[in-house]
Amino acid sequence: MSEVKYWIASISKEHTKRGVAGNFIQVCRGKQAPLNRMKKGDYLVVYSSKLSMEGNEKCQAFTALGKVSDDEAYSFQMTESFTPFRRNIEFFECEETSIIPLINDLGFISNKKSWGYPFRFGFFEIKEKKDFDLITSKMLKDEIARQYL
């Protein structure tokens, strides 16, 4: 089995709620390529910069945490003209966690003044497990739950 990887997806809080309810993730306006980078067993943290995709109200929090539970991306016809790609995710019960107090300690944020820059791409790998551990230590208050990550 390949090495477990850790990912962040930037998704509005509103869309995150839909994904959690349906046990799926959709990123980068439905593109397949980013989803294909994940493998079954990888972990995913969702960061929501805004409450809704159309609005401007800030959220700036990690809003969901889960594990990839399928083998590949699949298409899903949402409307007659929009068929995005998705991955199935086993989401964990967790607490929404503000990014603000974590910025200085997250290694993937190299420029602390422009801390939002990495999230503009919509999807990226967390290269250092300590960053994933820091985020999940705030999202999962239950010590037992953290043992399974």
Regions found by a protein language model. Name each.
Residues 48-54:
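Short, charged beta-turn/beta-strand-edge "cap" motif at the junction between a beta-strand
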Residues 43, 49, 68-71:
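An acidic- and aromatic-residue-enriched active-site/binding cleft used to recognize and process polar
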